[in-house]
Amino acid sequence: MPLTRDPFQNPALDKDDSYLGKSRASKKLPYKNPTHLAQQQEPWCRLSSTPTITSMKRDGFFFYSEIPKDDLDFRLAALYNHHTGTFKNKSEILTHQETIQDTRRIKTQFPGEFLPAPQPPLITSRANIRHWINPKKESIHSIQGSIVSPHTAATNGGYSRKNDGGFFST
């Protein structure tokens, strides 16, 4: 084995231009304005000056009393129509008012400042909604009208087996 050979030889790193022979000219034209001037023109000025909902919520003075506190509040605040929303996935069901409404006119509430109350959403006529009230108060401990199963909870200390069989657990 010759002494001049490198046992850990790495491939030589060459640029793309060395394989082609001569360098190619760039097809991309340089920008007309420098960056700091281009950001003051449309549409960049409008995009950078208009706050998003997320950036408004990060503001220290932002106050919104109806912010969901946990997953249950998040789901209850979501808009869901049981008639048209059947078998939709989670991302389609959990749609909030902020996603649908125009949020360009949301104003940040500063301390000591009182904003006018938002207009309530349009409510359909409640005359067509029927509400049934049971005239007889049912006991929650009664087994009358319960779901039929091979076990009954009427015994003390656990479940007992019915006459028709089935397994039980204690």
Curated annotation (Swiss-Prot):
Entry GO terms, CC: axonemal B tubule inner sheath; axonemal microtubule; sperm flagellum
Tissue: Expressed in trachea multiciliated cells.
Keyword set includes Cytoplasm: yes
Record key words, sorted: Cell projection, Cilium, Cytoplasm, Cytoskeleton, Flagellum
Localization per record: Cytoplasm, Cytoskeleton, Cilium axoneme; Cytoplasm, Cytoskeleton, Flagellum axoneme; Cytoplasm; Cytoplasm, Cytoskeleton
Domain of life per record: Eukaryota
Gene Ontology BP, a term: flagellated sperm motility
Any Pfam family the entry gives: DUF3695
Main location: cytoplasm
Annotated spans, Disordered: 1-37, 151-170
Described function: Microtubule inner protein (MIP) part of the dynein-decorated doublet microtubules (DMTs) in cilia axoneme, which is required for motile cilia beating. May play an important role for the maintenance of myelin-axon integrity. May affect intracellular Ca(2+) homeostasis.
Subunit annotation: Microtubule inner protein component of sperm flagellar doublet microtubules.
Stated name of the protein: Cilia- and flagella-associated protein 276
Natural source organism: Bos taurus
